[in-house]
């Protein structure tokens, strides 16, 4: 789809170092968050639930690329 200049694009989220450390630490313990975990993490980091959800989606994709085959349930 061609980008329409009349549409406003959402600004890219710039996470702070502290937010990234907290997100990475949580990712080390679990790659999938429950709704409650996502809400609590978002509130504690002053982020929206959507920002946390998308960060985890992107991080899982990165993890799967770095660890091919490990995400398959055997």
UniProtKB/Swiss-Prot annotation:
GO biological process, any: cell differentiation
Q: Which GO terms describe its molecular function?
A: DNA-binding transcription factor activity, RNA polymerase II-specific; RNA polymerase II cis-regulatory region sequence-specific DNA binding
Report the locations given in the UniProt record: Nucleus
CDD domains from the UniProt entry: homeodomain
Q: Which residues bind DNA?
A: 8-67
Q: What is its main location?
A: nucleus
Which Gene3D superfamilies does the record associate with it?
Answer: Homeodomain-like
Task: List the protein's name.
Answer: Homeobox protein H40
Organism field: Apis mellifera (Honeybee)
Supply the source organism's classification: Eukaryota, Metazoa, Ecdysozoa, Arthropoda, Hexapoda
């Amino acid at each position: 789809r061609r980008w329409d200049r009349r549409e406003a694009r959402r600004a890219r989220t710039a996470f702070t170092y502290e937010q990234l450390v907290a997100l990475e630490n949580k990712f080390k313990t679990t790659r999938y968050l429950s709704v409650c975990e996502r809400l609590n993490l978002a509130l504690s980091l002053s982020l929206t639930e959507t920002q946390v959800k998308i960060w985890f989606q992107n991080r899982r994709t990165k993890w799967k690329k770095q660890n091919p085959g490990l995400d398959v349930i055997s």
